[in-house]
């Protein structure tokens, strides 16, 4: 029952009559963030021996698509990630490299709409289509737009950097890169070295029941 109540509180709005836009009720942001951590622990955290997409070995694996595609958790992700990036100015669209970024971008888009903010979402393909419009980036055109690149989790920073470069090649300006979970294995340093502002909603040490990540 507590989770249902928490979800309802996420969407509690106060209306500003001057703008006719909803403003986010931020009083319980810490509660919402902790709720997201609980969902990740319950649904997405596995311990064992794993090979990550970066090729690195890990004693744990966080399958964030089990959370980002869950109908209960997606609204929470939308709020947490929106609060992370909402102060960035003049952002038009949010997206990243398929497929980890896709549900994150859509969750932010839907939550933002519920509070009067307009963000389009877009999908960066790993390879350009060879049929139809042969697009590398799907969704509303981002040429000339200011965008935020998102990712569910990042180990080395390579995926969001790739998405950012492709968005720039299309004619977009990248305002920042934002990830839901930073594995604390060098992604921040790589992304900032590449010239992008970096935001992370959670660190892996927020999720693991130990002081440091393996």
From Swiss-Prot:
Enzyme Commission number: 2.4.2.10
Database matches in CDD domains: PRTases_typeI
Top EC category: transferase
InterPro entries from the UniProt entry: OPRT, Or_phspho_trans_dom, PRibTrfase_dom, PRTase-like
Residues annotated for 5-phospho-alpha-D-ribose 1-diphosphate binding in this entry: 125-126, 129, 131, 151-159
Keyword annotations of the record: Glycosyltransferase, Magnesium, Pyrimidine biosynthesis, Transferase
Binding positions (orotate): 155, 183
Pathway: Pyrimidine metabolism; UMP biosynthesis via de novo pathway; UMP from orotate: step 1/2
Protein origin, superkingdom: Bacteria
UniProt GO MF annotations: magnesium ion binding; orotate phosphoribosyltransferase activity
A family per Pfam: Pribosyltran
Quaternary structure (record): Homodimer.
Family of the protein in this entry: Belongs to the purine/pyrimidine phosphoribosyltransferase family. PyrE subfamily.
Protein's UniProt name: Orotate phosphoribosyltransferase
């Amino acid at each position: 029952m507590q989770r249902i109540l928490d979800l309802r509180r996420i969407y509690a709005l106060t209306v500003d009559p001057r703008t006719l836009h909803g403003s986010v009720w931020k009083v319980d942001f810490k509660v919402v963030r902790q709720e997201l951590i609980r969902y990740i622990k319950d649904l997405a955290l596995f311990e064992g021996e794993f090979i990550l997409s970066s090729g690195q070995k890990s004693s744990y694996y966080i399958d964030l698509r089990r959370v980002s595609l869950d109908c209960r958790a997606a609204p929470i992700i939308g709020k947490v990630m929106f609060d992370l990036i909402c102060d960035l100015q003049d952002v038009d669209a949010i997206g990243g490299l398929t497929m980890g970024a896709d549900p994150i971008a859509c969750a932010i888009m839907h939550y933002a709409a519920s509070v009067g903010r307009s963000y389009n979402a877009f999908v960066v393909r790993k390879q350009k289509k060879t049929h139809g419009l042969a697009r590398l980036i799907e969704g509303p055109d981002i040429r000339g737009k200011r965008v935020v690149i998102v990712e569910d989790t990042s180990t080395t920073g390579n995926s969001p950097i790739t998405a950012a470069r492709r968005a720039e090649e299309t004619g977009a300006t990248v305002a920042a890169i934002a990830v839901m979970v930073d594995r604390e294995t060098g992604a921040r340093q790589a992304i900032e070295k590449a010239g992008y502002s970096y935001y992370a909603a959670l660190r892996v040490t927020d999720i693991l029941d130990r002081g440091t990540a393996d």
